[in-house]
């Protein structure tokens, strides 16, 4: 009996949101969360690398650590690329949102 009532609730909620705006909202919020997390991670990594680089310069230990630091900076660049991809997804969501808003307005006329 509960299966039928939960199924009817799912059908009703799907009928209430035929364009999937609720899912789009959840996806948007999750994407913002991921972007915020990436930015914080990049910030921490950058700060750590800069501190290490400063220590290297101050202590004069340059030869062996430069290659390691370059590899770390390459990792940071990869994270930045991933972050850029997330922003592109946000932009696509905004385009989709404008499309659905326009479609919704035209449907009401």
From Swiss-Prot:
Coiled coil: 63-95
Main location (coarse class): cytoplasm
GO cellular component entries: BLOC-1 complex; cytoplasm
Localization of this protein: Cytoplasm
rRNA-binding listed as a keyword: no
Superkingdom per UniProt: Eukaryota
CDD domains to which the protein is assigned, alphabetical: BLOC1_CNL1 (cd24144)
Region (Disordered): 1-21
InterPro entries assigned: CNL1
GO BP annotation list: endosome organization
Basic and acidic residues bias: start-end ranges: 1-10
Keyword set, alphabetical order: Coiled coil, Cytoplasm, Transport
Quaternary structure, from the entry: Component of the biogenesis of lysosome-related organelles complex-1 (BLOC-1) composed of at least BLI1, BLS1, CNL1, KXD1, SNN1 and VAB2.
Family: Belongs to the BLOC1S4 family.
Known role: Component of the biogenesis of lysosome-related organelles complex-1 (BLOC-1), a complex that is involved in endosomal cargo sorting.
Name of protein: Biogenesis of lysosome-related organelles complex 1 subunit CNL1
Organism: Saccharomyces cerevisiae (strain FostersB) (Baker's yeast)
């Amino acid at each position: 009996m509960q299966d039928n009532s939960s199924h009817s609730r799912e059908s009703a909620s799907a009928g209430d949101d035929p364009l999937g705006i609720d899912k789009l909202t959840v996806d948007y919020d999750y994407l913002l969360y991921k972007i915020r997390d990436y930015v914080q991670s990049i910030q921490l990594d950058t700060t750590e690398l800069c501190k290490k680089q400063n220590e290297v310069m101050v202590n004069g230990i340059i030869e062996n650590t430069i290659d390691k630091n370059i590899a770390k900076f390459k990792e940071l660049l990869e994270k930045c690329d991933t972050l850029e991809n997330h922003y592109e997804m946000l932009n696509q969501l905004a385009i989709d949102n404008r499309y659905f808003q326009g479609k919704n307005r035209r449907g009401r006329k």
